[in-house]
Amino acid sequence: MALKTFKPTSPGRRALVLVDRSALHKGRPEKTLVEGLTKKGGRNNMGRITARRRGGGAKRLYRLVDFKRRKWDMPATVERLEYDPNRTAFIALIKYEDGEKAYILAPQRLSEGDTVIASAKCDVKPGNAMPLKAVPVGTILHNVEMKPEKGGQIARSAGAYVQLVGRDAGYAQIRLASGELRMVSDKCMATVGAVSNPDHLNINLGKAGRNRHLGKRPSVRGVVMNPVDHPHGGGEGRTSGGRHPVTPWGKPTKGAKTRKNKSTDKFIIRSRHERKKR
């Protein structure tokens, strides 16, 4: 899909760049596949802020997207492509031959009327899902599971994809966009193709108000706060902070490694940080 630019009739329109969504469905979503979505405003069950800079935004309905693709050997036809406010990718409404409907992530080059299927072995075409042991090496994939039957977790956002680079001893080796090379079980499901809406990274909202519509609030720098609020706060006039950048809780930020899950380190063949070391 192409990008839309606008005539500078106001400061908020001058820099505005949006994705052209004219080819997407213009009506309401499939009623049986949506749920209400309560706004949390970044608060947990105790009412305390656990995610800062969240709040407000337009009301949304949550679309129930099928990330598991476990309806085997049942062809489905793509009824339409839709916008989903809860994610950067577009979604596709599919209808199985037995009449059941579902939402799936729409890959690139999938269009209305196409047929998709999930099977133990099927054609390598966008939207088809199969276990990694049946996928030819070199294939571009998205919505990849990390554990069998858990549902896709890797490469789900707009334009994302991974590449299958090899198989060995019950594991598949995939290369992520970050440069990381990791192993996952070859029983894990993956969907062929790259995720739709690759132009998402070129969007320019043009004004703060559009970010507020998305539920994002302003970000306040620690250096302009008081000492009670942030380690960088205080001082007469503008100060540099006097220490390496830290979070409000004193943890190093800007590049400090935060990964703690040692039990799954064995599945990472090459870290995404190794390119930076060279």
UniProtKB/Swiss-Prot annotation:
GO biological process: cytoplasmic translation
Complexes and interactors: Part of the 50S ribosomal subunit. Forms a bridge to the 30S subunit in the 70S ribosome.
Keywords attached to this entry: Ribonucleoprotein, Ribosomal protein, RNA-binding, rRNA-binding
Positions of region (Disordered): 222-278
PANTHER family per record: LARGE RIBOSOMAL SUBUNIT PROTEIN UL2M, RIBOSOMAL PROTEIN L2
Functional note: One of the primary rRNA binding proteins. Required for association of the 30S and 50S subunits to form the 70S ribosome, for tRNA binding and peptide bond formation. It has been suggested to have peptidyltransferase activity; this is somewhat controversial. Makes several contacts with the 16S rRNA in the 70S ribosome.
Short name of any one Pfam family annotated for the protein: Ribosomal_L2_C
GO cellular component terms attached to this protein's record: large ribosomal subunit
A GO MF term: structural constituent of ribosome
Basic residues compositional bias, start-end: 269-278
InterPro entries registered for this protein in UniProt: NA-bd_OB-fold (IPR012340), Rib_uL2_dom2 (IPR014722), Ribosomal_uL2 (IPR002171), Ribosomal_uL2_bac/org-type (IPR005880), Ribosomal_uL2_C (IPR022669), Ribosomal_uL2_CS (IPR022671), Ribosomal_uL2_dom3 (IPR014726), Ribosomal_uL2_RNA-bd_dom (IPR022666)
Family, similarity comment: Belongs to the universal ribosomal protein uL2 family.
Species of provenance: Maricaulis maris (strain MCS10)
NCBIfam families: rplB_bact
Name of the featured protein: Large ribosomal subunit protein uL2
Lineage, broadest ranks: Bacteria, Pseudomonadati, Pseudomonadota, Alphaproteobacteria, Maricaulales
PROSITE patterns: RIBOSOMAL_L2 (PS00467)
